[in-house]
Each structure stands twice: as C-alpha cells, then as structure tokens.
Amino acid sequence: TARHPVYHLTKKSIELYHNGLMAMVWERTHFSSPSLDKVELIHNHCGRAFWPVMQCGSCDQQIRPEDIAFNPGPGAGKDQRATKTRRRSSTDAQSSSKTLYNNLINLLGDRWTANLVALAFHGLKRFDEFNQELPVATNILADRLKRLVNEGVLSQQPYQRSPLRYEYQLTDKGRDLFPYFVTLLSWGNKYCGTDAGDPMELIHNLCGRPLQAQVRCDQCFEVLVATEVHFNL
C-alpha cells in the first residue's frame, strides 16, 4: 500500500508565525468571521487567554506607523520587474467563514495591491508617485487604487480640481495592516535577502533605535513562540 506523504513545517515556515498572528488580529478587528472569532489563544507560558500585540524590543512601546522612519538600506533599489500591461480583474474582499484569513488573502494576494499599501506607509499619496515607483500599467494602477478605496483601506481626497486629481491616505483599517507588513518585511529580510543587505532600515522614532518589532502576549508581555501557544476552538 502506498504511503501518503507527511508534511511538516520547516524553520523557514515556522518563522512566519508572527505574521500569521498579525493577520489574525487584522481579520478579527475588521471582519466578522465565525470560524475565527471563536478561536481562543492560550499562552502556555502564563496560562492565560491572550491577544497578540506588537511592541518595540528596545523601548517596549506599541509600534505605530506614524512613529516609524523608513531609511534606504544597503540593498535598496528600484523595482526592476517588467511592466505588466495585461489587466487582471480583481474581486472585492468579502467576509467568509470558510478560511481563517480569506479577507486578507483576497485583498493583498494581488502583488500590486500589496505594493500600494506598503508604499502608502512610506508616505506616497498621489497616483504619479505610485506610478513612478511601480512598473505597473496605469489602468491596473487605477483599478487597484479604486479597490483599496472601496474596501476602506485608503481614503480619497481631491488635491486639484482642474483636472480632478486625488490623494490617497491610509484609513484606520489600512493603518492596522502595519504590523502584518512589518513581520513580513522581517521574514523577507531573513529569507529572501541578497548579499547587498536589507533594502530598508526602520527606525523607531520614540527611542531612536533600529526597530526590533516583537509580537508579544498582552497578558505577560513575553515574546510569543509557536510551540508555547495552543488554540481552543
């Protein structure tokens, strides 16, 4: 009888744990998902039900996007991907109880949408600014910006009347994605980097030190480890 293959998480995948926790926090904050809302996380270290929080490892303060400075790192460079001209339709994110992170995946699964949110954290606001940074066709860029506005991640305000042009700013829903992006950046620097070094350096302005983002238990404030957490469903 042929054996079924058995799959195990590698160290590389286990280190996405904090990213997964931040995805769960965003989902539970902004969507009603019965399958996710009933999940209770228990921290074995303190024995309590907890909520993941992101704090600075240097000063213990909560990490907020407005307190972060983005500086080019030694591996910084412009996006060199070929310009995509073919339009791929995007679907609106809709609440689903079938998967735990369905809304986040629907929203950020498209590379251009994720890139736009990341650039918005850097302070980019205008269509031309996004277009200059990304090798994306203008019709696709317009479609993705419209979708982010429709989903409440970006707000749209006119800055010029003739011709009419808009600035795009992160809403609270959009700003709440920051911990997700920080954990993803940290993982990417470790496993997808180059010999040139990290492309970006984040400075925590509250303490003036390079950002050491840590995902912690909100009960005992210890850094969360995957093997020290269990789930009650």
Regions found by a protein language model. Name each.
Residues T1, V149-Y159:
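A short, conserved structural fragment
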Residues T1-G20, S162-F181:
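Basic, amphipathic "hinge/linker" alpha-helix immediately C-terminal to the N-terminal HTH DNA-binding motif
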Residues A23, L184:
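Globin-like tetrapyrrole-binding proteins
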Residues R28-A93, G193-L233:
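C-terminal regulatory/oligomerization modules of transcriptional regulators
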Residues S96:
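Conserved phosphate-binding loops in nucleotide/dinucleotide-binding enzymes
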Residues T99-I140:
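N-terminal helix-turn-helix DNA-binding core of bacterial DNA-binding proteins
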Residues L145-K146:
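Short, hydrophobic-biased segments on the C-terminal half of alpha helices
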